[in-house]
């Protein structure tokens, strides 16, 4: 990332140009810096690395979702609803999400440490997984499907090999056959432990990486500062919603 950014931002050439600019200008000055970051994803207070969620499917094929993350404009609700929609093979509009409430999902952790979507999204998917198991067992039993192929949820259909079933229709049939279409979900971050007194252990489950080059100008008489240009590279993995990630940057 660092070397790629040096090249992409033309850092070395700009650094030389800025040195020349500063030597010729008494009051207007420029600066340029490149900064890498390696950011750990998890709470170092280990017990906070847990989350719950609640998912219901209704007979019209819509889904209700509640989780323990706080939406404060960063897009958490949107991203977790997208995760649920993608897992069920539904359109985003089919997911109805209600505001966080401890009467629905108790003992919520803080929405911080860049872990909110990780924790609550995983809890929501855990609930989805339980419901999908119920649905798939019902389909296999009713329609006598004996192969071990994994079910595919896509475009509002549930697909087993060469057989496909409309999601809404199967949900209605499952309800009439007394199949549970609701579940709570839970997630706790694995493989982490940390002794704050000794500063030993594995406090983070994984790291994210990035780097930035910033060029600024300052008027040394007035103190006015202007950000002239910023180049950023993030190793963003597979973003749930690229537009929201760009918005946060």
Question: In which residue ranges do the predicted regions lie?
Answer:
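Cofactor-binding beta-sheet edge motifs in enzyme active sites
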Residues: 1, 7, 13-249
